[in-house]
Amino acid sequence: MSEKEGKVIPETNGMKRPRFDPVKLGLPEEFTLTDYTRLKGCSCKVPQPELLALLQSVSTTPGRRDVGMDCSIVKLQHKDETGKPLYMVSTTDFFFPSVEDPYLQGQIGAANVLSDLYSTGIDRCDTVLMLLAASTDMDKTEREVCTQEMMKGFVDHVRLAGSDVTGGQTVMNPWPLIGGIATSVVAESQMIRPTGLQPGDILVLTKPLGCQIAVNLKQWLRRPSPIFEEQIQGKMDSEEIEELYNAAADGMKRLNRMAAALMHSHGAHGATDVTGFGILGHAKNLGSAQKADVCLVLDSLPMYRGAVKASKLMGDKYRLFEGYAAETSGGLLVAFGTREEAEGYIRELYETDGEPAWVVGRVVRREGSAPYALLQKDYKIIEVGAKVNDKII
C-alpha cells in the first residue's frame, strides 16, 4: 500500500508471484518448507488455557484490563507539538512455516506481525524488527536459499505496508522461524483501544476461517498421513485442495491495513485479530478486556468451502466448527456501534481493497458468570469459495 494525501490506498504491486518452483531456486524438486516443522503457523502457540494460567503467576500492570491483548500500549514521557501525550504501541509475533514457499512464508510472517498493530486502528507502522531462525536440519544450500527467501518476502511485504525493517535477530534452530516486532508512536486519536465495546455493537470479520485445515491438506497431498488416507483421499480431489490452499495463502499474506484505516471513519469501538486461539478464543479474550461487562455472540462464520468439507470428513478434528481452529494471519474482528456503520465499513472495504467482510455477530450484556464470548447454537456457516477474476465463487 502507499499513501496519497494522507490516506491509505490499495496497491497490488508485488502481491502476485509465480507458483513456487524449488528447482529454480537451486533446491531439490521435492523440497517443501513445511517438512521442517511439526507445528505450522500460529498453531504453534501455547494453548490459551495454559497461557492464561502461566500469566496469572506473572506480575502485570495492576488495573490494566487490556494486558494480554494484541499490543502493548505505553504512554511516553514525550508529547506532540500541541502538548498532548504520545503512546508507543508495540507487538511481537513469530511462528514456524505454514506454507511450502519460503518467500511466501516471509510475506505471511510480515502480515501477521503487522496485523496486531492494525487491530488497534493504526495503519502506519514506524519500524519493524525481524526475528528469524535458520534451520539446522537443512543442508547448507537449502538453509542459505530458504533463509534468504524468507527475509526477502518479509522485507518486501513490510515495504508494501509503508514501513521498513530496521534491525532484528537471526539464530540457528532445528525448525525455521519468521516474525518480528512492530512499533508505532501515535497520539490517542490515531488509535482505537480494544476496550470500548458496548452492548448492541455489531461484529464484523474481514477474512474467512479455515487456514489450518488448508495448509495441512496441502502437505498431506504430497506426503499422505493416516488421517488423509483414511478420511480425505478419494473424497476430495487434488484440484479442490489446491484451490483451498491458494485461497488461504492469498488470505494469509493479505495485509489488514485497509481494514484498520477504515475503522476510524466508521466508528469502530475496538477490535482484535484472529490467529492461533481461533475466532472464539480471541473473541473471549477481547470480551474479557472490556470496560463494560459484555459477551460477544457469534451467529455467522465465513469459512473456506474446502475447509468446511474437509472438517466434516475428519469429524472436526481441528475444531473449526467449534471456533477454536488456529488461524495464521487471520482477519480483524471489529465491533461497530450500529448495523449501518458495520455495513458501511464492509461496503467501503470491498470498494477499496476488493475483499469481502461479513457481519458475524453482536455484543450483548453479560449476565452473571456467562462467558465473555460464545457461539450461538444454531450459528450459520457462510461457505466462501476461491477468487476467480476478482469475484468470490
From Swiss-Prot:
Homodimer. The gene is SPS2. Disruption phenotype: RNAi-mediated knock down in procyclic and blood stream forms (strain 29-13) impairs growth following prolonged exposure to oxidative stress. The keyword NADP does not apply. Disulfide bonds: none annotated. The keyword Phosphoprotein does not apply. One of its GO terms (molecular function) is ATP binding. Binds 1 Mg(2+) ion per monomer. This is Selenide, water dikinase. Residues 1-21 are annotated as: Disordered. The active site is at C42. Keywords: ATP-binding, Kinase, Magnesium, Metal-binding, Nucleotide-binding, Selenium, Transferase. SUPFAM superfamilies: PurM C-terminal domain-like (SSF56042), PurM N-terminal domain-like (SSF55326). ATP binds at K45, G68, M69, D70, D93, D116, G167, G168, Q169, T170. It catalyses: hydrogenselenide + ATP + H2O = selenophosphate + AMP + phosphate + 2 H(+). Mg(2+) binds at D70, D116, D273. One of its GO terms (biological process) is selenocysteine biosynthetic process. Its EC number is 2.7.9.3.
